Amino acid sequence: MPRRRVIGQRKILPDPKFGSELLAKFVNILMVDGKKSTAESIVYSALETLAQRSGKSELEAFEVALENVRPTVEVKSRRVGGSTYQVPVEVRPVRRNALAMRWIVEAARKRGDKSMALRLANELSDAAENKGTAVKKREDVHRMAEANKAFAHYRW
């Protein structure tokens, strides 16, 4: 950690098609081996499919899906006197988005559909309907935090 000054967070350029920073971040998370144009085409075709299914605009449908996957609390390990406790802590807004996007991409990669665009579209539509692997992951994290509520006073 630097001692001199706090280093500001880099500004992310909004994506070219919709002008959304959130979507640009999602493309970056999906990107493999620096192939951004490939990642963008996958995301855009997935969003088109999603918009046709839901009847909403591409960005609106994406926002709904992301909102249903965002976690509000998570557990962090805290060592107290020789034993480790899973302490529930609130998730910061930036991390909420990052976790939600990461979980959606992971869930889409594990699906068995034909193309990645189709997998992503299916996972996003499942997330919009509050079902699917990414939503299940959020529920598991929330359940874990609820189960360890007794250790909330160890927060730092």
Curated annotation (Swiss-Prot):
Domain of life: Bacteria
Disulfide bonds: none
Pfam families: Ribosomal_S7
Similarity comment: Belongs to the universal ribosomal protein uS7 family.
Gene that this polypeptide is encoded by: rpsG
InterPro entries on file: Ribosomal_uS7, Ribosomal_uS7_bac/org-type, Ribosomal_uS7_CS, Ribosomal_uS7_dom, Ribosomal_uS7_dom_sf
Name this protein carries in UniProt: Small ribosomal subunit protein uS7
Entry keyword Ribonucleoprotein: yes
Gene3D superfamilies hit by this protein: Ribosomal protein S7 domain (1.10.455.10)
Keywords: Ribonucleoprotein, Ribosomal protein, RNA-binding, rRNA-binding
Biological role: One of the primary rRNA binding proteins, it binds directly to 16S rRNA where it nucleates assembly of the head domain of the 30S subunit. Is located at the subunit interface close to the decoding center, probably blocks exit of the E-site tRNA.
GO annotation terms (biological process): translation
Leader sequence residues: none
GO molecular function, one term: tRNA binding
Ribonucleoprotein is among the record's keywords: yes
